[in-house]
């Protein structure tokens, strides 16, 4: 990826960081809150990223004075597409927001289920000792918890030098947001089902943003304002990306055709080999397609899904 594309992906990953700021008790809308946090507390001075965070919604974007090829327009459209795909209306919900609501299980409504299972407020534990299984106990977030998450973001984001875009920073940022936001709901609207995490929404937005940039570049489109903002309804119908599936056939035969002696060790070794082999294939694909690991939706068991650019 080139420097500009790295900035675009980073902007998309950070576009909703203001939700952490707002839920920690800072009474400012999440767009401005994210902008102020990154600029004043992190010391980030990259105009592209700051504009994208502050103007990723229609109203502030329409009032802002930006270049026609501003990164903010890509973040705006990518956020809209991701939001359309990961939010469902709660039929019994009343208008408003419940900022302390916990993340619900995606299995609550799957296959016509009608369950009420919730994840506890938690960060991913490097030790692996804690497994956050959803339960009927609804443990809500507190402003203190969000303040702790904000503090961790402050400490870790300051270690990334955004003035020198490096592709590895994308992976570091992706891992950081995964660790802190996997169990934080993206939307706390009482009219929506809160079963999509802030991490998954941010990752999906980054995946779309990377594809859209490459699509526009391939088609010689430099006026992002007209293409993505003024004519956004037309762009939604364009095939700028696709869902791609890859499968390594015959893995069961490869794994289980073994001798009895040392069977467990051989099973582990072959499973690990397949996992590394698939990761290598994905890294090669992403490198050729000039995309980031945000575009990987799922990988495991010799199978994967990713979102690449569509050039048709």
Label each residue range with its predicted role.
Residues 1-131, 184-188, 234-236, 256-267:
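Divalent metal-dependent catalytic cores for phosphoryl transfer on phosphate-bearing substrates
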Residues 1-7, 20, 33-44, 199-231:
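Alpha-helical phosphate/pyrophosphate-handling elements in metalloenzyme active cores
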Residues 30-34, 197-205, 267-278:
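Phosphate/oxyanion-binding active-site loops and adjacent basic polyanion-contact surfaces
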Residues 126-191:
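Extended, charge-enriched "interface" segments that sit outside catalytic cores
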Residues 244-253:
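Catalytic-site or vestigial catalytic-site microsegments of nucleotide-handling domains
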Residues 261-289:
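Surface-exposed, low-hydrophobicity interaction/linker segments
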Residues 281-305:
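Conserved helix-loop-beta segment at the catalytic/binding core of cyclic-nucleotide signaling proteins
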Residues 312:
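Conserved small/polar residues in nucleotide/adenosyl-binding loops
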């Amino acid at each position: 990826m080139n420097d500009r594309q790295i900035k675009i992906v980073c902007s998309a990953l950070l576009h909703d960081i203001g939700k952490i700021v707002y839920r920690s008790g800072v009474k400012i809308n999440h767009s401005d809150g994210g902008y102020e946090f990154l600029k004043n507390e992190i010391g980030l001075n990259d105009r592209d990223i700051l504009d994208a965070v502050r103007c990723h919604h229609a109203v502030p974007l329409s009032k802002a004075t930006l270049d026609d090829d501003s990164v903010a327009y890509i973040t705006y459209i990518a956020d809209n597409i991701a939001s359309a795909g990961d939010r469902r209306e709660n039929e019994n919900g009343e208008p408003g927001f419940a900022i302390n609501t916990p993340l619900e299980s995606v299995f609550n409504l799957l296959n016509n289920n009608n369950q009420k299972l919730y994840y506890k407020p938690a960060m991913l534990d490097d030790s692996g000792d804690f497994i956050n299984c959803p339960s009927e106990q609804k443990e809500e977030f507190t402003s203190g918890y969000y303040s702790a998450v904000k503090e961790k973001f402050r400490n870790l984001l300051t270690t990334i030098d955004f003035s020198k875009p490096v592709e590895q920073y994308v992976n570091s940022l992706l891992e950081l947001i995964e660790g802190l936001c996997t169990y934080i709901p993206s939307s706390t609207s009482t009219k929506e089902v809160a079963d999509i995490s802030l991490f998954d929404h941010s990752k999906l937005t980054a995946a779309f943003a990377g594809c859209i940039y490459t699509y526009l570049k391939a088609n010689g489109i430099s006026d992002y304002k007209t293409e993505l903002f003024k004519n956004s309804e037309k762009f939604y119908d364009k095939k700028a990306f696709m869902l791609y599936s890859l499968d390594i056939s015959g893995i069961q035969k490869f794994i289980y055709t073994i001798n009895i002696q040392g069977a467990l060790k051989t099973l582990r070794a072959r499973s690990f080999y397949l996992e590394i082999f698939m990761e290598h294939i994905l890294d090669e694909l992403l490198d050729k397609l000039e995309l980031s690991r945000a575009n990987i939706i799922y990988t495991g068991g010799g199978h994967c899904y990713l979102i690449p650019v569509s050039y048709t």
